């Protein structure tokens, strides 16, 4: 693929983002990724935003349908229809996740030439295995949970050694890894400990905040604090869903 073709695909992705056509955006950035050339920071972010929206729509649908399916007052036929529809959404969600994981393993992680990119892509790998874990059951769930944790842990080790505590990618990783502990592993103590450590480490080094990433970093710090507040007050198990965000 020529440089011109690649630039056109990136431009298409930007147009698709502006018009909120995230499936088109994802396909354009998938084609860019498949050229095998390392992505620039801008291209990396376009890819991430595209697939986050594509998979996010399915995750949201899945939660709504699952909730309807579990309502005991529904008739057997309605429950069956809800189950079938949930399974259809699940299939779409799985296909998207494995598409992203394929791009990560085949192109993105092997080509990552600096710690920032490596952490970004390993975090992404952890995220997409986590999304699979949200809908998986049995042995399949155990496998994707292990894969998610391994990717997050690899990213976490690199970020601690190579990135400032205020770096938005390091903070975003801590945010999502803590959500993984809370939601997927059902380990609120570990989730709180990880989130608090990341928040405290960033506060201690606020003077290292890069002007360019100030907004991103402080937003993720706020999300970490929001989650800590929610998780520490959630002793009654009122079913509030922990917030997740801050993917850059």
Curated annotation (Swiss-Prot):
Its main location: cytoplasm. Gene3D superfamilies: 14-3-3 domain. PROSITE patterns: 1433_1, 1433_2. SMART domains: 14_3_3. It comes from the Eukaryota. It holds the Pfam family 14-3-3. Coiled coil: none annotated. InterPro entries: 14-3-3, 14-3-3_CS, 14-3-3_dom_sf, 14-3-3_domain. Keywords: Cytoplasm. One of its GO terms (cellular component) is cytoplasm. It is found in: Cytoplasm. Adapter protein implicated in the regulation of a large spectrum of both general and specialized signaling pathways. Binds to a large number of partners, usually by recognition of a phosphoserine or phosphothreonine motif. Binding generally results in the modulation of the activity of the binding partner. Belongs to the 14-3-3 family. Homodimer. This is 14-3-3 protein zeta. It comes from Aedes aegypti (Yellowfever mosquito). The gene is 14-3-3zeta.
């Amino acid at each position: 693929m020529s440089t011109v073709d690649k630039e056109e695909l990136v431009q298409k992705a930007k147009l698709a983002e502006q018009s909120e056509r995230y499936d088109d955006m994802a396909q354009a950035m998938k084609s860019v990724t498949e050229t095998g050339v390392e992505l620039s920071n801008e291209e990396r972010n376009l890819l991430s935003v595209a697939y986050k929206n594509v998979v996010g729509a399915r995750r949201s649908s899945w939660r709504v349908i699952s909730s309807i399916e579990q309502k005991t007052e529904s008739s057997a036929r309605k429950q069956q229809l809800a189950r079938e529809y949930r399974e259809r959404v699940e299939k779409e969600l799985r296909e998207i996740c494995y598409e992203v994981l394929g791009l990560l393993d085949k192109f993105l992680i092997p080509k990552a030439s600096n710690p920032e990119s490596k952490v970004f892509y390993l975090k992404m790998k952890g995220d997409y295995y986590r999304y699979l874990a949200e809908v998986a059951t049995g042995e399949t769930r155990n496998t994707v949970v292990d894969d998610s944790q391994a990717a997050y842990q690899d990213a976490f080790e690199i970020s601690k050694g190579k990135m400032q505590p205020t770096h938005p990618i390091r903070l975003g990783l801590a945010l999502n890894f803590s959500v993984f502990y809370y939601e997927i592993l059902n380990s609120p103590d570990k989730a709180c400990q990880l989130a608090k450590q990341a928040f405290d480490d960033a506060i201690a080094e606020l003077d290292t905040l890069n002007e360019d990433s100030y907004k991103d970093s402080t937003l993720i710090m706020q999300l970490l604090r929001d989650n800590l507040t929610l998780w520490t007050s959630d002793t009654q198990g009122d079913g509030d869903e922990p917030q997740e965000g801050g993917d850059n």
